[in-house]
A protein has these predicted regions:
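A conserved pocket-lining segment of Rossmann-fold NAD(P)-dependent short-chain dehydrogenase/reductase
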Residues: 18, 76-80, 123-124, 130-156
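NAD(P)H-binding glycine-rich loop region in Rossmannoid oxidoreductase-like domains
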Residues: 1-31
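Active-site "gating" loop of Rossmann-like NAD(P)-dependent oxidoreductase/epimerase domains
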Residues: 54-81, 122, 137-138
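Short-chain dehydrogenase/reductase
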Residues: 26-30, 67-92, 126, 147-152, ...
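Conserved C-terminal active-site "lid" loop/helix of NAD(P)H-dependent oxidoreductases
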Residues: 215-245
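Active-site Tyr-X1-5-Lys
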Residues: 42, 77-109
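Glycine/proline-rich active-site loop of Rossmann-fold NAD(P)-dependent oxidoreductases
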Residues: 103-105, 119-132, 164-175
Length: 286
């Protein structure tokens, strides 16, 4: 961190299936964050640090409470599966660490809390955020879990990090970055409207809960979603809009842009009828 003024810490394990033990995700998340913050404190030059947490550190265990969750809310730790718990503990340890720094080592802290990140891909690596798209487009999931997700566009999340670095009133704040919440059926219907004519068969039927329990015996990734079946995710993006000045990207655009980029980059097989993103091509030609 020598000679650095600003640091953004974005890395944290995001498993596609439940780990064998909690420590597989909790220890890297907490210790990794602590190591970055310690290095910043020793640098003598770092003025502000942005830590990427998650909206799960806010809504887990608080779904269906009947009110809009904000940055003031914290997940119920006892209700958290390992990944969600890792995000809560890593963020809480970050706030506590900075709070206890001596004056000569103090720096400003901002935390960004995105949801399930979607949008175009700019790298050649597979990641957990691609799983829903890949399974739907390739019909690897014949039925859907009745799951609601807080959707974030990766471009909005990137903008939030930059604004968190530069805005004078950002330090000491958490910022939920989301375009809104969407049920899996709405997600699938968005893909279906765009891609059925291009040869993709997208499932839109919900799987009953007992069916998911049976599937979880053979697919560990299914097990992790069962506790959240049917639960409403109601989180506010007011601070994102009013304080960071970010207009949320429409969820449908995030979903469609990600699908096209996954197909174009080879993460999803092209059908014979695939035409590419015509709206993007039209924008480029206009």
């Amino acid at each position: 961190m020598k000679d650095c003024d600003y640091v953004i810490h974005v890395a944290s394990p995001f498993p596609s299936a439940p780990p064998e033990t909690e420590d597989e995700v909790i220890a890297p998340a907490v210790n990794g964050t602590k190591s970055v913050l310690e290095a910043c404190a020793k640098s003598g030059t770092v003025k502000r640090v942005i830590v990427t947490s998650s909206v799960v550190a806010i809504h887990t265990g608080n779904q269906d409470k009947g009110y809009m969750l904000t940055e003031k809310d914290w997940a119920v730790l006892e209700s958290c599966p390992p990944y969600e718990k890792s995000k809560v503990l890593a963020e809480q340890s970050a706030w506590e660490f900075v709070k206890t720094l001596p004056d000569e080592q103090k720096y400003e802290l901002v935390v960004v809390n995105p949801g399930y990140m979607l949008g175009p891909i700019i790298h050649g690596s597979n990641c957990t955020s691609m799983e829903i798209h890949r399974r739907m487009l390739q019909r690897e999931m014949p039925m859907l879990p009745k799951l609601q997700l807080a959707i974030s566009d990766v471009r909005d999340v990137a903008t939030a990090h930059v604004k968190s670095l530069t805005l004078p009133d950002a330090p000491g704040n958490r910022f939920i970055i989301t375009s809104g919440s969407m049920w899996m059926r709405e997600f699938a219907q968005t893909l279906r409207r765009e891609f059925t004519s291009q040869g993709y068969s997208i499932p839109t039927t919900y799987c009953p809960k007992f069916g998911l329990r049976v599937m979880s015996l053979f697919d560990k990734s299914v097990k992790s979603v069962i506790p959240n079946i049917g639960k409403v995710v109601n989180v506010s993006n007011e601070k994102m809009i009013k304080e960071l000045g970010i207009t949320p990207t429409e969820m449908e655009k995030s979903i469609i842009d990600m699908a096209y980029s996954m197909i174009d980059e080879g993460f999803v097989k092209r059908t014979k009828g695939y035409n590419g993103n015509q709206s993007r091509n039209n924008e480029n030609n206009s």
